[in-house]
Design a protein with these regions (language model features):
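Accessory nucleic acid-recognition modules appended to NTPase machines
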Residues: 4-184
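Conserved nucleotide-binding/hydrolysis micro-motifs of P-loop NTPases
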Residues: 95-96, 205, 240-242
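Extended hydrophobic-aromatic, low-complexity segments
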Residues: 125-127, 168-172, 184-185, 195-199, ...
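Conserved catalytic cores of phosphodiester-cleaving nucleases, focusing on short active-site segments
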Residues: 160, 185-205, 216, 233
Length: 266
């Protein structure tokens, strides 16, 4: 568990913790990211630009260069430094094929930095003017659901090894996501028992399970399966649909509550 989570109060809601522990200027976590970066880096301006672009969802070198205005050589230097410090993760699409270096993407690997550079750093003057509670209501809350959606995808990928453990799967595996010219898969698990799991994540309300399953089926058809592995299909969702539809054979469905149960051992 990251040390900063110890500052959160389990008796408070997520909103209350963010207001009192992160957005309040007097809180310990309010300046923690700045202290961390000042201790590790010099000339923070370009690093701030890169981290803010990553927090906004930019991930490819081309996107990051365009967003930050930093030339390729300088961008690579700053990204490599952030990767070495453990703040940023270098990622490649997961499949049976050897990934090309041109397919690399980057993501903020630290949850506090990801939130801080998404909501706090770009809006510091506004948040200071509004105060923590009103700042949350006007700056954070309108974008929070979309932000949680991306966090949910990450949680699903991190939960797949625990699902394998509970299902008695002992074959070696790698877990990640896949992106290509015409398909993006949220969760991929490539196992050495000639099995590959492909998963779709849905944070918003699911009105039709068959429709979501059909979207996943289309991604299964487009996913490069060079070794002709058996494909397992998984749907990850915040909660089950209000109306239970027909049982879909060959499909595993996991809700947020299921994933919490894995983490807590419940």
């Amino acid at each position: 568990m990251p040390a900063y989570l110890l500052a959160f109060d389990d008796a408070q809601s997520v909103e209350q913790n963010l207001v009192t522990r992160v957005l309040d200027e007097s809180a310990a976590l309010a300046r923690e990211p700045e202290f961390l970066l000042h201790a590790e880096l010099r000339d923070l301006v370009p690093y701030h630009s890169v981290l803010m672009a990553l927090a906004q969802g930019k991930s490819s070198p081309a996107q990051l260069a365009k967003s930050t205005g930093i030339d390729v050589r300088g961008l690579n230097y700053h990204l490599n430094t952030l990767v070495e410090l453990g703040y940023v993760q270098r990622r490649y699409p997961v499949s049976e094929a050897e990934p090309s270096t041109r397919s690399v993407r980057y993501a903020l690997d630290d949850s506090l930095l990801r939130f801080w550079f998404r909501f706090v750093f770009p809006h510091q003057s506004v948040l200071r003017l509004l105060g923590p509670e009103r700042g949350f209501a006007e700056v954070v809350r309108p974008e929070l659901d979309a932000y949680f959606g991306r966090c949910f995808e990450r949680l699903c990928r991190e939960s797949l090894p625990l699902l394998y453990l509970g299902e008695g799967i002992r074959a070696p595996f790698i877990v990640g996501e896949y992106w290509g010219a015409d398909v993006q898969v949220d969760v991929v698990g490539v196992r050495q028992d000639n099995w590959t799991d492909l998963g779709e994540c849905k944070w918003g309300d699911v009105s039709s399970l068959p429709a979501l399953a059909a979207e996943l089926d289309e991604k299964v058809r487009r996913y490069p399966n060079a070794r002709n592995a058996t494909i397992g299909r998984r749907l990850f969702m915040r909660k089950s649909p209000a109306k239970a539809g027909p049982r879909l054979p060959g499909l595993r469905v996991h809700t947020l509550q299921d994933l919490y149960g894995l983490e807590t051992g419940a």
